[in-house]
């Protein structure tokens, strides 16, 4: 139980360190919520628990950042990875008639970022974001930040996930139909994440975004830009990411505000100096890609309606590599603002002495453009990532069930004498409110005041108190808290899921097995029509290397998938999840196949 005195007003000063003060924490004691359909989005119908049999949020979970601690070298935080705004809905087709197969669930993530960012030595050596960590950083509302790819790449005539090719599918171009109004969606584990322009967060932070109250959708404001974008998140290399607006001159805060101009153009021949892969074919990677991938060369599919320009990240050329006129290349800082990593060196309101910083990349029309938030190579050394503090740390913030309620000064209505008491509250909490005239004897006004729903404050009115009591003190005590998800009660059902059966159910290392995979037609998200071929078939296991089928097909009459796997001699033994992917969606069977 917690007690607070209503007549005490506490003002919390902003911390001088933006790595601490930039996090959005005021909503952490409010339940995360979703819309399931467009109609519910318009009517503002929300849910605090949800299920589609594949992913279940069985109890309410608090939104976003739940704790922040720090040491000399690290910022540590815990997040549910659920947005503080209402998330959803998500669809799987442009007509928005088929619900997306995945729903977000509490991830209970512990993460850290370095307090000091360092650059690689030599500076041209950059590490890829395509590693074991899926999140390349986190937004300040606690939502995961992903690189611009969707996990698929082209190699050997097919697209696979996780792919090993050098032509990486661009997420915004291929998955945007599955994004919610905040430009965000979730993978098959329920991890809510953003690849491009976190517009709902930008609205919360006042970053030149308008909300349509009728449709509950967001759009870039049409008014003049008047202030620098805020910090939207932090990347694993310790650098901030800002919204799209910065100072016109990178080192002059008095130079005006404008949209940052990205450094990439499509390889369609429309810009002076750029090639046209429609006519030449995808015979070569752009210079920025080979410069960062270790000079690996690879060709891709011919441009077509199936593989249009923009489908792959490598369909974009970096202006700094192109000839603008004669022998002169386009110049960073003159022709464009952001380098090939989507980074600029500049002063910002939080860093008046200058910093390297990522920026959200938008077109003049406000549309995300590659590389959107970040490229898939880190600019700095990516020393941060998933971690729990194993050193002595200092608490900066505690949220959710551990938040300390704070009281506001009582408000007196002089016409009626009513006194309104307001305090920050925890959703799901029950409060006892007491009053006294002398701080010695207390009378109970209520023992059952429920915290306001979908709010961060709760109020109670004592009628006529001003006229009855010349002096009045109040105190509030939280006496109960409803059950909530602390990170251990969210479920991802196994057994019969998107796949109903696998045959055979096991195979030996060092051999080749052919699996017959029957999709579950009764699953909440029906499988694609039988004549639609899968894009990849994989076997996955935590801590083990993914095993990818090189040859697979689907019977166009029955819909049964056949996939051949070569089980490596050194493969990790044990149970694997079988995954059949069709574009951005995956149908799975947990523990469906055992490697002996």
Which residues make up each language-model segment?
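Solvent-exposed N-terminal domain segments of exported/luminal and surface proteins
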Residues: 17-173, 180
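Hydrophobic h-region of N-terminal signal peptides that target proteins for export
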Residues: 7-16
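Ser/Thr/Pro-rich low-complexity tracts
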Residues: 485-596
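Extracellular-facing segments of soluble proteins and assemblies that are Gly/Ser/Thr-biased and enriched
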Residues: 116, 124-229, 233-239, 245-247
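Sec-dependent signal peptide recognition
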Residues: 1-7
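Extended, compositionally biased non-globular segments
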Residues: 237-239, 244, 251-405
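A glycine-anchored, Pro-Gly-centered beta-turn/N-cap motif
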Residues: 190, 354, 429, 472, ...
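Short, composition-biased motifs enriched in small/polar/acidic residues
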Residues: 405-485
